Structure formats: C-alpha cells, structure tokens
From Swiss-Prot:
GO terms for biological process: regulation of translational termination. Keywords: Cytoplasm, GTP-binding, Nucleotide-binding, Protein biosynthesis. Belongs to the TRAFAC class translation factor GTPase superfamily. Classic translation factor GTPase family. PrfC subfamily. Pfam families: EF-G_D2, GTP_EFTU, RF3_C. GO terms for cellular component: cytosol. This is Peptide chain release factor 3. Increases the formation of ribosomal termination complexes and stimulates activities of RF-1 and RF-2. It binds guanine nucleotides and has strong preference for UGA stop codons. It may interact directly with the ribosome. The stimulation of RF-1 and RF-2 is significantly reduced by GTP and GDP, but not by GMP. Residues 13-282 form the tr-type G domain. It comes from Psychrobacter cryohalolentis (strain ATCC BAA-1226 / DSM 17306 / VKM B-2378 / K5). HAMAP family: Rel_fac_3.
C-alpha cells in the first residue's frame, strides 16, 4: 500500500508510546486518569476508592479488577496532547502480574516510573526496572503524593540512585510538603508553580511566578524550612548541568518531577517532559533484520491477547504494536507464523475498554485485531515480508497448581478456557506425560484466583486448584537426538508439554534441577521461551 514517506515521518515524529511502572498503590491508576484528563480523553474523573463506589477508574475494566481496585489487565489509551499523539499502556500494578507487564514493556518506547514519596523505592518498582534495563528503556520519574508528608526529597533521590542504579536529574523541586505544600520550582524555567487544593478533577493551570523567593512563600514555610529548601535547591541545580539526552535515551539517567496525581498537580509537566525528551517510535529487532519505524511497508507484532473485553461481545482481541508503515482499514496483511494472508477490515483503537473502529494507524500506535483463536502472543503481521519480531518471552512460573474439575462433564469447556487463557498469557498450562493432569503455572498467587474467577464467569466452569510438588519448570532443548532420547527415558516422570506443545521439565526441587543439569550437560534447561 502506498504511503507518503513525508507524511509517515511526520506521524512517527508525533508519536510517544509509554507505560507507567510502579509498586501497587503508588498512584498509577490515578495518574492514568489525570493524563487522560489533560489529553481531553475523559471529562469526569472516576477515582478508584473502595469496592462500593460506582465510578470506577476508567482504566480498570474487568469486573474482578473493579471489585478489588487493582489493575489486572493491560489497557491501551490514545490521546492527543500539544500537536503530539500519546499512546499510554496501563500495566497491572499488582505484584502477581509481572509477565503481562513485561510483555507490555516490549511494546513501548519509554516508561514513566511513579514513586510514592512517603515510601520511596519499593520491591515491585525494582523488578520492573530490571525489565526496563533489559531493553534500555528511557525512564521519566514522578515522585507522587506531595500533598501528604513525604520523605526528604534529597534522601529519595539518593535511594533511587542507589537501589535502581540510575542517575537522577530533577526537573522540578518541591517547596514544602503535606499541609505546607506550596508547589514546585521548575529548574529549567526558573518559575514557581503554585499548588491549589480542590482541582483534582479539572485542568486548572497552576499560577506561576518567576523565581521562588517571595515573602508569602517564606512566611508559609517558616525561616527554617525555607532555608532548608534553598540549601537543597542549590545542590540539585548543580546536578542539572549534568543532564545528557543520550544517557537518558540509554536508560542510564532519569529526569525527576514532583507533584500529586490525586491533586492533578505536576501531571501536565510529566506530559511536557515526555514530549520534550522521550523518543518517538524506535527500530525493532526481528530474526531477519532490524525494522525502522519510518519504513513505508507495514509491520507489527502481537504483545497481548485479551479475552472477553466486553462480555456482550464474547470475543478476544489481539493487541498489536505497529512497528513500521501505516495501517489502513481493509488492508491485506500476512500472518507470518501461519503463512496466511488476512484482510483486516475491523481493527480497533481503545480508550480503556471503549472501542472505536480504526481507519488508520502509524508506528507506535496499538491496534486491536479480532481474534478467533488463530493469533498468539508474539505473532508478526507484515505486508508480505517474512519477519519475526523477537524479545517477547515466556518466563518460568514460580507457583504451580493441579486443576480439579468439580463437574467432570465440563472437561471440554475447561480445556477450551485454559487454552484461551494461556494463549492470552494469564497463566501457563503444563500437561505431564505420565497422567492426564492439568498443571497451571503462574508468577503469583493472585493469578490463580483470576483464572478461577474467569473460568467461572466466562466459561461456566468451576474448579478447585490444589498444591502440587513442583518447584520450577525449564524448557528443554537438545540438538543431539541420542542424548535427548536418553534424557527423556530417565526424566520421563517429570516431563510435560506446555500449552504450545514444547517439551518442559517439571523439577520437584531446585536441588533436583541442579542434579539433572549436571548429569545432562548437552541438554539446555532454559527459564524463558520466546513466544
């Protein structure tokens, strides 16, 4: 399909595709909503409170998420902001969903890290940063909850640098906190932005003044606190000179902003920083070659499958990241893994569960393809070229359960449900070779609850999960057929096939795994598998 290269370059330059990473309860869902407010994508903010509130957050749209007030599914939201097009991928904040979150991070060009100002760097943030590290993802940081008592800002920066091994360069610096939160001083603009309570749900532009030394600020903070602010400001002003865009783009340095997502203060500064510094869509690796965003032929990969986004539709949607070229309604694409040509007449764009039919999409955009069971995570779509995008792995689960069906007559529905949920990446299924058991693997306990809930709600299947003595799993690979056959004979009782039919070893203990690895050096025991 002919694409005007000039128009394509312009559209690519406008795009910013990012995800928010944080520990649960650092304010990620609130931040998502406020970003949508600034992007004029929503008019009313539905703050997530308890399970009794009617107005749930726009980005939490599966019934279980709304009941529990946590984001389980990755949703996708697109909105315009100052001549740019922003694609925001909301990631599950709950500790159990690292696999889904990881796959989402393969589809973004930068990330916004949120830190709770009272708690500092938390465990989940550390894990997510490790994933960003693997991909050298540029990070913008936002220290949240300045309208409450937080830790000393300099102490927070030191902790981020020490724990996450990333250099911090403040863009804004807080003046006071909690009851005495005056606002922030913007270091590059030499302006103070004043915080006013009560504007959490609207887009009131903060009052600004040049500099920061004003009698009313001194009076509000008191002499001691103002002196402390000036002292810390001097230190961070020296750091600002070290800001290096290349180091930021390599994921080694992060611009830091302060504010309150709940109070909608500092959110537009995050968007401004994103547009100023974050990269437009980057090149993506494939097994065959690197694909640049500005290439005129279409290509993209599926990083997520979501079943039953709308119970009324009973469907499954494959989320595809556009890597190059332009999607146009009705275009013919090659589904590379199957070697089949398909006509895509009804791709979707999203505002968290609200679907709209899509006429066109550019690199960096996320589109939804209707999936009737033929699309898997990691699949590539092109205009004909044989390209297989890389870097979308399965991780070895750390928890295992045996599935026990309450009604044996429902076994067909159970298998269908588990197959679909595993294709979607909600769980991994293993079938031991010595019996007819179905073993589920997950990264965290909550995943089992989600699977049980969804099997019951969507497939009308009730099961119980019981513990099973499996410590970990490894994918098996061996080029030497004789050695592989010998290994299979010896390890028969521990072997299984995963949902994709790949041979796996279910280790009863870490010690056992180590013994098998020592005994069979020609066999590769891998803890990840590419989709």
């Amino acid at each position: 399909m002919s694409v005007d290269p000039k128009k394509l370059n312009k559209e690519v330059a406008k795009r910013r595709t990012f995800a928010i990473i944080s520990h649960p309860d650092a304010g990620k869902t609130t931040m998502t909503e406020k970003l949508l407010l600034w992007g004029k994508a929503i008019q009313v903010v539905g703050e997530v409170k308890g399970r009794k509130t009617d107005r749930h957050a726009t980005s939490d749209w599966m019934s279980m998420e709304q009941e529990r007030g946590i984001s389980i599914t990755t949703s996708v939201m697109q909105f315009p902001y100052k001549e740019h097009m922003v694609n925001l991928l909301d990631t599950p904040g709950h500790a159990d969903f690292s696999e889904d979150t990881y796959r989402t991070l393969t589809a973004v060009d930068s990330a916004l890290m949120m830190v709770d100002g009272a708690k500092g760097v938390e465990e989940r943030t550390i894990k997510l940063m490790e994933v960003c590290r693997m991909r050298d993802t540029p990070i913008i940081s936002f220290v949240n909850k300045l309208d409450r008592q937080i830790r000393e800002p300099l102490e927070l920066l030191s902790e981020i640098e020490a724990v996450l091994k990333i250099k911090c360069i403040p863009v804004t610096w807080p003046i006071g906190m909690g009851q005495d939160f005056v606002g922030v001083y913007h270091l590059t603009e030499n302006k103070t932005y004043f915080y006013e309570k009560g504007h959490g749900g609207d887009m009131t532009v903060a009052e600004t003044r040049e500099g920061y030394d004003y009698p009313d600020i001194r009076e509000r903070l008191g002499a001691l606190m103002f002196a402390s602010f000036e002292e810390s400001l001097e230190l961070v002003q020296m750091a600002l000179e070290d800001f290096d865009v290349d180091e930021f783009l390599a994921g080694e340095m992060t611009p830091v902003l302060f504010g309150t997502a709940l109070g909608n203060f500092g959110v537009n500064m995050v968007l401004d920083t994103l547009i100023k510094y974050a990269p437009p869509p980057k090149a993506h690796p494939t097994n065959e070659r690197e694909v640049a965003a500005t290439e005129t032929t279409f290509s993209g990969f599926v990083f997520k499958i979501q079943a039953n986004m709308d119970p009324r539709h009973r469907d499954r949607i494959a989320f595809l990241r556009v890597c190059s070229g332009k999607y146009e309604k009705g275009m013919k694409l090659k589904h590379v893994r199957l070697g089949k040509d398909v006509r895509i007449a009804d791709a979707l764009t999203f505002l968290a569960g609200d679907r709209e039919a899509l006429e066109e999409a550019y690199p960096g955009d996320i589109i939804g393809l209707h999936n009737h069971g033929t699309i898997s995570i990691g699949d590539s779509f092109t205009e004909g070229e044989e390209l297989n995008f890389t870097g979308i792995p399965h991780f070895a689960p750390e928890l295992f359960r045996r599935v026990i069906l309450k009604d044996p007559l429902k076994s067909k529905a159970l298998q269908k449900g588990l197959q679909q949920l595993s294709e979607e990446g909600a769980t991994q299924v293993f079938m031991p070779q010595i019996n007819n058991d179905l073993i589920l693997g997950a990264v965290g306990v909550l995943q089992f609850e989600v699977v049980a809930h969804r099997l019951k709600e969507e497939y009308k299947v009730q099961c119980i999960f019981e513990p099973v003595s499996i410590a970990t799993v490894r994918w098996i690979h061996c080029d030497d057929e004789v050695a592989l056959a010998k290994f299979k004979r010896k390890a028969h009782d521990q072997l299984s096939l995963d949902g994709g039919g790949h041979l796996t070893y279910l280790a009863p203990s870490r010690v056992n795994l180590q013994l098998m690895q020592d005994r069979y050096p020609e066999v590769t025991f891998s803890n990840t598998r590419e989709h």
